[in-house]
Design a protein with these regions (language model features):
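Conserved SAM-binding loop
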Residues: 45, 60-165, 281-285
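Charge-rich, low-complexity intrinsically disordered regions
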Residues: 1-50
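Short, solvent-exposed coil/turn segments
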Residues: 6, 25, 74, 237-239, ...
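Short, charged/polar micro-motifs that form catalytic or ligand-binding hotspots
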Residues: 3, 122-133, 238-243, 270
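S-adenosyl-L-methionine-dependent methyltransferase catalytic module, highlighting the catalytic core
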Residues: 100-102, 106-113, 137, 141-143, ...
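N-terminal/domain-start segments enriched in small and hydrophobic, helix-friendly residues
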Residues: 53-54, 119-121, 195
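N-terminal module-boundary/linker segments of secreted carbohydrate-active enzymes
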Residues: 47-59
């Protein structure tokens, strides 16, 4: 894997505003930290998902997790993992009013990631990692599939700019608790957070400071959350288990690496751009 650009690239940041042109590198970095980051100014090319995807070499052996009807990468070196077959994905897309031809023609691996026995230069997922009931085991499984030096390319929702805004950030303790429990389904807490505490999902409104009205129907929402939790053995209910911002994600991954739970380290981490509800990261297998 090529060396990713830094979190703050002074040249990229200076190019966003002629008023910044005279700043040297140190001053540009300081200015971004003091002003640009909170405004969502792009300070690195890989802050944008399209550039993150372009950074993955076309000749790299790649596994994309959860493509559904919009695979991010296509080509002879790309394989897909999903919980549904290609035919099931097309049927689901049709029911949702989505063109089924947008789905991949073939899903190479149907079910869990643990079934895969080959290795890859890169693994890619978008808005997937936050759904994993056991984050540590997921990262361990991805690490197992990566060749030494390979990268896990991630597009992750930033909880500040999506419907998770009012839900507290995830903690290291919570991540390790899930690992110790070998959690495979979402908890009652995750159900309550999703059905009771979520708000609108318009990132521009969130960037402007409009996070929605105070939730007034919590009683009915809570009753619904309990009902959905009771049905969890009948069908899989998909909610977020984890709520990240770039600093929180960095701290959790770094600590998991430090204590030996994973062999992945952060090779690149990029703050969200204005109007978007996601940030990008690259984890690299170190051994």
């Amino acid at each position: 894997m090529r060396t990713p650009p830094p979190t703050i690239d002074p040249a990229t940041y200076r190019a966003t505003d002629p008023a910044l042109a005279a700043l040297d590198d140190a001053a540009a970095i300081a200015h971004y930290r003091a002003h640009g980051r909170q405004k969502g100014v792009v300070a690195s090319p890989l802050a944008l998902r399209e550039n993150l995807l372009a950074f993955i070499d076309d000749d790299a052996a790649l596994l994309e997790i959860g493509p559904f009807f919009r695979p991010l990468k296509r080509g002879p070196n790309v394989e897909y993992l999903d919980v549904l077959t290609a035919e099931q994905l097309r049927e689901r897309a049709t029911k949702l009013g989505i063109d089924p031809n947008r789905c991949p023609p073939h899903i190479h691996h149907v079910g869990g990631i643990e079934q895969i026995e080959r290795s890859y230069d890169a693994v890619l997922s978008a808005h997937v990692i936050e759904h994993q009931p056991d984050l540590v085991t997921h990262l361990q499984q991805v690490e197992r599939l990566l060749k030494p030096g390979g990268g896990y390319f991630l597009i992750i929702p930033d909880k500040r700019y999506c419907f998770d805004h009012f839900i507290p950030e995830s903690s290291l303790a919570g991540v390790i608790q899930a690992y110790e429990e070998r959690r495979t389904t979402h908890t009652l807490a995750s159900m309550i957070e999703h059905f009771v505490l979520t708000t609108h999902n318009d990132p521009e409104r969130h960037w402007r400071g409009d996070h929605g009205r105070e939730i007034r129907d919590r009683r009915e929402r809570l009753k619904f959350a309990y009902a959905e939790y009771a049905r969890r053995r009948e069908r899989y209910i998909d909610v977020h288990s984890w709520y990240f911002t770039p600093p929180v994600f960095r701290a959790i991954v770094a600590t998991l690496k430090d204590v030996g739970l994973i062999g992945l380290e952060i090779a690149g981490l990029y703050h969200p751009a204005y109007g978007r509800n996601e940030f990008c990261a690259i984890l690299q297998r170190t051994t």
